[in-house]
């Protein structure tokens, strides 16, 4: 087999093991807003909702949970999410699709997808660091809440 054929075969094989992440930043720049999250009852992974809420609170949001299937016009700022966990030697976050709506219109979206990750070992990630990364990219103008507080307040 020629070297070109080997390279082509390697590219085809590796392209099937892709992990993708695509973020459209929200552009929101106000701190400490209330963010209403529409609970997705299909997400049953232990602790996911607590982790997602904690990550958003660290970003400065006051999180209020809305019932499953609430309209995106229920609050001025609404978040929805779809999350898939898979098992392959261990349970891991395989896909997360986070959407933010401002006044009923999509204002930002973050999608992490390792469903085509195949044998790629980078698919084995922990939920909190990945959600933190996605939220930081989704709200790039908002600094983490702890970093915004004066040192005297943090020490108290």
State where each predicted segment sits.
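A sequence-composition feature that detects small, non-aromatic residues
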Residues: 8-13, 18, 32, 90, ...
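A structural "domain/chain start" motif
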Residues: 4-10, 16-65, 147-156
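Surface-exposed short loop/turn segments
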Residues: 21, 55-125, 129
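Generic hydrophobic secondary-structure signal
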Residues: 6-14, 56, 98-100, 131-138
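C-terminal/domain-edge helix-coil "capping" segments
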Residues: 18-28, 57, 110, 114-156
């Amino acid at each position: 087999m020629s070297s070109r054929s080997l390279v082509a075969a390697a590219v085809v094989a590796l392209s099937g093991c892709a992990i993708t992440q695509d973020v459209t930043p929200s552009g929101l720049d106000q701190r400490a807003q209330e963010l209403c999250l529409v609970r997705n009852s299909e997400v049953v992974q232990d602790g996911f909702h607590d982790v997602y809420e904690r990550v958003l609170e660290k970003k400065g949001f006051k999180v209020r949970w809305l019932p499953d299937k609430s309209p995106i016009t229920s609050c001025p700022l609404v978040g929805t999410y779809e999350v898939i966990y898979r098992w392959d030697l261990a349970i891991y976050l395989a896909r997360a699709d986070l959407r933010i709506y401002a006044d009923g219109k999509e204002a930002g979206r973050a999608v992490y997808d390792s469903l085509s990750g195949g044998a790629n070992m980078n698919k084995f990630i922990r939920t909190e660091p990945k959600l933190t990364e996605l939220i930081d990219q989704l709200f790039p103008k908002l600094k983490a809440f702890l970093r915004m507080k004066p040192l005297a307040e943090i020490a108290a």
